[in-house]
Regions:
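Bacterial N-terminal signal peptides that target proteins for export
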Residues: 1-9, 224-225
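Structural recognition of the beta-strand scaffold that forms the well-ordered cores
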Residues: 37-42, 80-85, 141-145, 196-200, ...
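C-terminal motif of bacterial Sec signal peptides marking the signal peptidase cleavage site
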Residues: 17-20
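Short, solvent-exposed loop/turn and secondary-structure capping segments
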Residues: 50-52, 93-95, 153-158, 210-211, ...
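N-terminal extension/subdomain marker
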Residues: 22-138
């Protein structure tokens, strides 16, 4: 009995230790609720057979800048951000960009590896839009496109032009490029039907011809009349203006 009493403080210590371990409250990750969807579309920007002029490295920087802005502003303004990135001519990934309010950080949640949708066709683009809706059925959609482009001229029309690290709609050769009509029909025939805005982070897409072709499938068109350098929009500065209730004035002013 005396021996037990001498060790009683030690026994009590271990009881308290194990009791405190059981009483630890687990961290529960919480995320913002969302009521609208931003689809960030970054297709393959090289050629069908090579990586020439591809912008993948710049897209990676764009995504990092978006994450930085989200963390600085501590949220996504109730916007479900779905991102498609083509890694090469055959492989792509779809992921969700979301804000962990518990840990106060932006996280990437992979939705589909080897996602496909890299080949260029109107039906392929329509199926991709429907895939996005299946991931994020909010009923309100916006579209941000980063790639190469030739404005309103048909696919392949810039094949004789000097190639520089700038943007346009699609890849670097005719096999990887979309006509504006492909985009219009893909939106109209998909479950999206119409989007709040289309932003071309590309060259030469702000013109009457493009705006007229897309007038029935978008409320707003955000684009440039001239070249857009490979770095694209400074998302680290303006991404918060794109999310939620879009502030077009601050968005555009922040770019220039």
């Amino acid at each position: 009995t005396i021996h037990f009493l001498k060790n009683l403080p030690l026994v009590a210590f271990f009881i308290l230790l194990f009791s405190s371990c059981h009483d630890e409250i687990p961290i529960i990750d919480a995320y913002e609720n969302t009521n609208q969807t931003l689809f960030v579309y970054m297709p393959w920007t090289g050629t069908k057979n090579t990586s020439e002029n591809n912008l993948k490295a710049y897209f990676d920087k764009n995504i990092a800048a978006m994450r930085q802005n989200i963390e600085q502003n501590k949220g996504v303004k109730q916007t479900d951000i779905i991102v498609f990135v083509a890694e090469n001519q055959t492989r792509s990934v779809i992921f969700r960009m979301k804000y962990n309010t518990t840990r106060q950080r932006c996280e990437l949640d992979t939705l589909k590896r080897n996602a496909g949708f890299v080949s260029v066709s109107e039906s392929n683009l329509r199926n991709l839009f429907n895939q996005v809706v299946s991931y994020s059925n909010t009923g309100k959609y916006s579209l941000l496109i980063g790639c190469h482009g030739s404005g309103w001229t048909p696919r392949g029309s810039d094949s004789t032009m000097p190639k520089a690290l700038s943007r346009a709609f699609g890849g670097s050769d005719i096999d990887m490029q979309y006509n504006i009509s492909d985009l219009r029909n893909a939106i109209a025939q998909s479950q999206m039907k119409k989007v709040s805005f289309i932003c071309f982070d590309d060259c030469y897409m702000a013109n009457v011809e493009t705006a007229y072709a897309l007038k029935d499938v978008t409320e707003m068109l955000v684009a440039s009349t001239s070249e857009v350098m490979a770095e694209g929009i400074p998302y680290d500065k303006v991404f918060s203006y794109i999310l939620g209730q879009t502030d077009y004035e601050k968005w555009v002013d922040g770019f220039y």
